[in-house]
Design a protein with these regions (language model features):
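A structural boundary signal for the start of the first folded domain, especially the loop/turn
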Residues: 1-144
Length: 144
């Protein structure tokens, strides 16, 4: 059985699209079952594997979730980390964690996407000629 059914995957994809509507920022969601290393190291590995560091403004954000190990991380590229408050990712993670604790993985991810999108549009508003540089599909990994 798939981790997310088609409806849940579509809900996450639409949340990514909505979050990116008013920003040049690029957001991806990466899901795998287990994380066999430090969660931030694992997220950074997939950040690069998914070419998120190649965006025009270096404003990619990755939400990484290891479902079985119950670990997750949010990382942003250099352009974002220069302008967001130091606790930005921590406060976003806390909001997501409230949903995760209730067993609602999809709602937690959607919450993270909404918050990331709101903040990104403040620092990286959508401009003329901005394009969707990265796929909005969920990246399902299997310990790659």
């Amino acid at each position: 059985m798939a981790l997310f059914n088609d409806e849940e995957q579509q809900r996450i994809r639409v949340a990514i699209e909505d979050a990116e509507k008013h920003t040049s920022g690029q957001i991806r969601v990466c899901i795998e079952k287990t994380c066999n290393e430090a969660v931030l190291d694992r997220a950074a590995k997939y950040f690069h594997k998914l070419d998120m560091h190649k965006t025009k403004h270096r404003n990619g954000v990755l939400i990484y979730v290891a479902t079985v190990d119950r670990k997750f991380a949010i990382i942003g590229d250099k352009g974002i980390n220069k302008v967001v408050p130091p606790d930005f990712w921590d406060s976003t993670k806390e909001d997501m964690l409230e949903h995760f604790k209730l067993g609602d993985l999809v709602e937690g991810i959607v919450t993270g996407l909404e918050i990331a999108g709101e903040h990104l549009q403040k620092f990286f508003p959508h401009g003329a000629g901005d394009t969707n540089e990265l796929s909005d599909d969920i990246a399902f990994m299997d310990g790659e």
